[in-house]
A protein has these predicted regions:
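Basic, flexible Lys/Arg- and Gly-enriched helix-loop patches that mediate nucleic-acid binding at interfaces
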Residues: 1-240
Length: 240
């Protein structure tokens, strides 16, 4: 790998900035100052330092985000803020993208990565990766609805796979319910449409899980962090 490409991948700066940093003598390779951007290095063997700090190359990165409402699950959008706008410059420089989509008014767990193979595996219909949502509903969900979800709901354009519906709480006075829904698909507005089929309306929707990943309760809306080693290992094992 070229030295300048390595430095860009380590988020030291853009390619132009990296060339200037090399000229300034701020980069060393195996203890010697190096000014050539074209130098071929072995990222697994050579020790590269920037301002004395050892740099470690990461091919892939994995971030958990608590996506807020009002933000688009995309890398760019002409009208709305995207989830990438919530990242810092270093995280954005890794060229990550959201794995799947959450509607603009849905909040909760979102995985961002630059690992296309993992993203493809998690989104593949063949994998049946479960996703769990917590929904606040206008209307009273019933045991009959639980059975309807379990059979597979026939919508206009497709029939849903059997889904698990748990009724968390019911408030008869306010005509509200709180439910937990687990689905293996992720079609457009699916949970909202499934609830709508039962004659009720989702007024708030939060994703809690995706496969083995569970939303960190300590993450405020709009916050993100790297996956822990254990979280990543469990995720990789689950799609192996």
């Amino acid at each position: 790998m070229r030295l300048d490409k390595f430095l860009v991948a380590c988020a030291v700066g853009s390619r132009t900035e990296v060339k200037n940093l090399l000229k300034a003598g701020r980069v060393t390779v195996n203890g010697k100052k190096e000014k050539s951007a074209k130098l071929q290095i072995d990222e697994k063997i050579d020790e590269i330092r920037f301002d004395g700090q050892v740099l470690e190359y990461e091919e892939f990165v994995y971030y958990m985000m608590n996506k807020p409402q009002g933000v688009i699950s995309a890398t760019e959008d002409p009208k709305h803020r995207t989830v990438l706008d919530l990242l810092d410059d270093i995280a954005r420089s890794k060229e990550v993208f959201p794995v799947g989509r959450l509607d603009i008014d849905t909040h909760g767990l979102l995985l961002l990565t630059n690992d296309g193979q993992l993203a493809h595996a998690l989104l593949s219909p063949k994998r049946h990766v479960d996703k769990t949502y917590l929904a606040e509903v206008k209307g009273i969900m019933t045991q009959e609805d639980v059975e309807i979800f379990a059979k597979g709901i026939p919508l206009k354009d497709f029939t849903c796979q059997p889904a698990k519906l748990d009724i968390v709480s019911v408030d008869s006075e306010k005509n509200q319910s709180k439910i937990r829904v687990t689905i293996a698909e992720g079609k457009f507005h699916q949970v909202k449409r499934m609830v709508g089929y039962c004659g009720k309306e989702v007024v708030d929707l939060q994703r809690l899980t995706m496969g083995t990943l569970i939303l960190d309760e300590n993450l405020e809306r709009g916050e993100w962090r790297r996956l822990t080693k254990e979280e990543l290992e469990n995720l990789l094992v689950s799609i192996a």
